[in-house]
Design a protein with these regions (language model features):
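Mixed-charge (Asp/Glu-Lys/Arg
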Residues: 1-155
């Protein structure tokens, strides 16, 4: 199939950022909202958070995203880094298991990205944390608690 590049007008980009920023403020004042938004809204929220932290972030398409929801371009005095992020919106009592972390790490390696970040509205299983510990220079895990700290710091 032929691929087409769609240019999003700057005004529309700004409108999207305003809505997402408003959502970030709502989550900061009422964290329960985080569990009521759609998975795509969660991805957009995390995208906005990483942008506010000083990164350039690309949100991938909703389906067949190649195992990554966000592509984070981090430019610093140490170099240029490409970081893949996967967002897992889960109910508070359902952990993200090791399989998801392995899958993201496989995508990071296959695409020769610098590192990966898994972000969730829940928490990570013991096995997921154990696995991440082995690859900690190339994989970060952000659970609900850490995510809320970061949202509060950026509001």
């Amino acid at each position: 199939p032929e691929r087409k590049i769609v240019r999003v007008p700057d005004k529309l980009k700004q409108d999207i950022k305003v809505v997402t920023h408003s959502l970030m403020n709502q989550v900061a004042s009422n964290p329960k909202i985080l569990h009521e938004i759609t998975p795509r809204q969660f991805e957009e929220l995390v995208c906005e958070l990483f942008e506010k932290e000083g990164n350039h972030v690309e949100l991938t398409k909703q389906t067949r995203d190649g195992g990554k929801d966000l592509i984070i371009l981090n430019n610093s005095s140490l170099g240029d880094f490409v970081i893949y992020a996967e967002c897992k919106k889960r109910a508070p009592k359902y952990p993200v298991n090791v399989g998801f972390v392995r899958e993201l790490y496989g995508t990071v390696n296959a695409d020769n990205a610098t590192a990966g970040i898994m972000v969730t509205t829940s928490y990570f299983s013991r096995d997921a944390r154990k696995y991440q510990e082995k690859i900690k220079s190339r994989m970060s895990l952000i659970d609900y608690s850490e995510l809320m700290k970061r949202i509060m710091a950026c509001k």
